[in-house]
Amino acid sequence: MLETGIRGEAKEVVSESNSAQAMKSGELKVYATPSMIALMEQAAYKSVAAELEEGKVGTLMNVSHISATPLGMEVTAKSELVEIDRKRLVFKVEAFDERGMIGEGTHERFVIDNEKFQEKANNK
């Protein structure tokens, strides 16, 4: 059963492929904000995937990237389900490298019917 307090986690090592330079979100070889956001979303998704048979889609990210992380360092994203409002799920998300917090914010996901959602997208 889905309840607030469910936590998730996802990890990756900073490499050239997830750097700001490679993601075209900046010029430097440091962990890219889009990569951090994707890792946070992955942590939230993984935390509820086993609890819900229905589909889940991300709809909102409000995140601050507060510290740069160099190549080779591991990043861990953590999520906590803090609110359930019918089909809307709200998560607190945080990201840490080996030296401390690098990002924080909130993420919303909605529970959906996968087939109907895919059909609607395909009919655009």
What spans do the regions from the language model cover?
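Catalytic strand-loop segment that frames the active site of acyl-thioester-processing enzymes
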Residues: 1-31
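Hydrophobic beta-strand-centered segment that forms part of the acyl-chain substrate-binding groove
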Residues: 44-76
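Residues at secondary-structure transition points
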Residues: 27, 31-35, 70, 90
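Hydrophobic beta-sheet segments that form the core/acyl-binding groove
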Residues: 63-98
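C-terminal binding/interaction regions
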Residues: 3-6, 85-91, 100-121
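Hydrophobic residues positioned within well-ordered beta-strands of beta-sheet architectures
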Residues: 8-10, 59-61, 77, 91, ...
